[in-house]
Amino acid sequence: MNEDFFTSDVTSLFFNSSCGIFPTIAASYPIANYPLSGLTVYFDVSKGGFTFRNSLYNGVGYNGWSKHDNPFLVRPKKDGIFNMSQLEFSYSGGNYFAGAAVHTRHYGVDPDGNQCEPDQSTKKASCAWWVYGEQKVWQAADKEIACMAQYSENTNHDNGCYRYAELGVAYTDSCNQCGLSGQYARFYQGAEYSLELTWRRSLKKWLSVQPSLQYINNRNGDFVVLCTRLTCEF
């Protein structure tokens, strides 16, 4: 999932405090979101500036290698079925996305936001939908500035997260990519606000380092998180 969806340039720059991908999906379903994996049937179709993507997954992701815990399990009756569809449009320096995901089972959460085990899930479908866009607003030689806006909701307010929004801006040149973004997520146990400042520096053509500073506020208090990402391309 992490390689097929939410991988556009500005979106993938940010670490995000809430689950990496949109939390209306990642915090609501135990799906194949890193570090979990699962089998999928995937296809995409492109024509002109449009691309349509679709992935069909087993309803639960796994990260073990035992008989009852491995990425190759397909158990729609117990785990449910999870489907993601997205339509993309590229035009004049911008990329725009709209999509929806449907899960055939409901995974409830306790007051602390902990998700129930798969065998405690119920047969109740829900949907998460999202829209987001990235648009270049300035460009000169190898330098550019792009803005990004995202919004997503889950139809079941008893899921882990039912609303998410983000605004961000990114500067890119031949050796640097810097970004600033603010996020809002409405989890079952309360709201979370976060601010992220990140800088990706290319050391060589194949090597880059990216520190990220995040400020997070939720019902448990205020937190500051420092992360670093090292990327090798070959």
Feature-to-residue mapping (PLM):
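Transmembrane beta-barrel strands of outer-membrane/channel proteins
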Residues: 1, 54-58, 98-102, 147-153, ...
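Solvent-exposed loop/turn segments connecting transmembrane beta-strands
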Residues: 63, 77, 123-124, 153-164, ...
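Repeated loop/turn-to-beta-strand initiation elements of outer-membrane beta-barrel proteins
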Residues: 49-54, 93-96, 140-145, 175-178, ...
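Membrane-embedded beta-strands of outer-membrane beta-barrel proteins
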Residues: 41, 85-87, 131-133, 147, ...
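Outer-membrane beta-barrel "beta-signal"
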Residues: 222-234
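Outer membrane beta-barrel
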Residues: 1-59, 89, 159-166, 173-189
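Long, well-ordered mid-to-C-terminal structural blocks that present hydrophobic/aromatic surfaces
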Residues: 90-174
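Residue-level signature of outer-membrane beta-barrel architecture
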Residues: 41-47, 88-91, 135-137, 171-173, ...
